[in-house]
Amino acid sequence: MKATLQNWQSWDIRITAVILSCLFSLIVIASHPIPNDDAFSYLKAADLYNQSGLEAMLSAYGWYGYSALIAITDSFLPLDTLASAHLLNMLSCALLTWAFITLCAECHHGERIPFFAAAIILVYPTINEMRYELIRDFFYWACCLSALIHLIRFHRSGHWMNAVGWMLAMITAVFFRLEGLLLLALSPFALLMSGKDTMKQRLYKLMPLGILGIVGLTGALLVFSLAGIHLVDVFRFAYRWYLPLLTDFTQTILGAADSSNLSYHLSSQLAPFTGKGLLVLLFGVLYSVLANLADALGNGLAVLTLYWAYRYKTQPEESARWPWLFFLGGSLFTLLLFVCIMQFLTSRYAVMSALMVLVLLPRYLDQLYVSARAQLRLPLFNKLFAAALFYFTVDSLVSFGYSKQYIEDAIDWTQTNVPADSMVQTNSYALAYFTGLVSDYDQVETDPLVTLGTTAGKHFLILALSHRDAEARELASMQAGLQEVAHFANKRNDAIVIYRIN
């Protein structure tokens, strides 16, 4: 395996993959100039960091280390905050690509493994579709994969430098998402599961990781404390909406059951935490987690992975197996907590678990390659593999949805026709930010019905309406004092309507 990692072909494929990853990011960003709604909170926090420093940013927004990095990048480069954020995301995707290929090479023997790993991560639709979004997750995933690489190497060699690499990667992951604390706490215990070593040898390997983890966290607490920032208070503030749900976890679970329509099957005759009621509850929660994971993988890829896992029963090599399983288990547990506490599904929170599953695919593809070569069907394998790459690339890089050009047109019109000193009310983050007419562009109320009721003292109302907002359209047409001055829409009738308030 060491020879494989040092092989120039393995090195070359990672460099090529990183370059392609950056190219894909540029393509996706260019075709999606309007970022996700969460992006505007990160941008506003970065602006606050530039104006008032880290303490003010953390006090106002909580655990926004990602925004601090955006602000620092913005101060060093001749770019605006948005461009700096896109640059960081492009680099984080490149780092994730590099880490995934390296991790697959650590987990499986074979000279073709890096190539298949590069192909998988580059055409993985869930990642590609999010490349234009400003999210801290890309760095978090990359750091977690890097930590797993170092943990596997430490498990194999016992070298302290790998232990230090694991600690630094995990501390950096925590800098982006506090959920990394769970993996930081759990992952070292993978070293206790090795079948070859005695328990004394396992404990001897575990000790350096425990010491380094404690030293790393203590050092971070001390540095921030000396800077006048109390991380415990920041943690409480960042999770102020979720901690009460954890303290009353029974009601939280029942709330999750109600949100997922499990309450239909639970009644006074079928208590939720005993007997059949408990089975129904566990099945529902487990189904939610697995459905979220399948959505993150993509339904087709999830079915193929399940089939190949059943047929080939492939696992990472022995020295990598338990660290990989602990990271998979930790990420699934984090997803479980998210589903129970937040009570809705989103594939983004399942990507870490999906990446752990995708680590198995290069070995499956390599086995298919070997089988095809033995059966003299290699040309067929190559054609099918190329077709799959083409399909996933087009599917994830080309947008087949309804155009959002109308949003850009509305922004251009507003910048040209609305005076800069106007008081503007809007329910669109994008219009608030790009027009420069709303100072608190991250505090937008997105409900058009609520926005229609908060126009007092304003000069213009810029209303974002989806094709389903019939009630808001009717109310706006009847509301006194609103004069429509511009209307922009796509073929589905998603629209931006601009009103002058008389």
Question: Regions from the language model: what does each represent?
Answer:
Residues 112, 168, 188, 210-214, ...:
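Signature aromatic-anchored transmembrane alpha helix within multi-pass, membrane-resident enzymes
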Residues 64, 68, 77-95, 130, ...:
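Loop-to-helix entry region of an early transmembrane alpha helix in multi-pass inner-membrane enzymes
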Residues 37, 62, 132-139, 346:
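Short acidic/glycine- and proline-prone juxtamembrane loop motifs at membrane-interface regions
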Residues 50, 104, 151, 384-439, ...:
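Membrane-embedded, lumen/periplasm-facing catalytic core of multi-pass transferases
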Residues 31-45, 57-72, 79-83, 232, ...:
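Extracytoplasmic catalytic/substrate-binding loops of multi-pass membrane glycan-assembly enzymes
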Residues 87-108, 146:
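Transmembrane-helix motifs of polytopic, lipid-linked glycan transferases
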Residues 21, 116-125, 149, 170-174:
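Short helix- or helix-capping micro-motifs
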Residues 275-320, 331:
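Hydrophobic, aromatic-rich transmembrane alpha-helices
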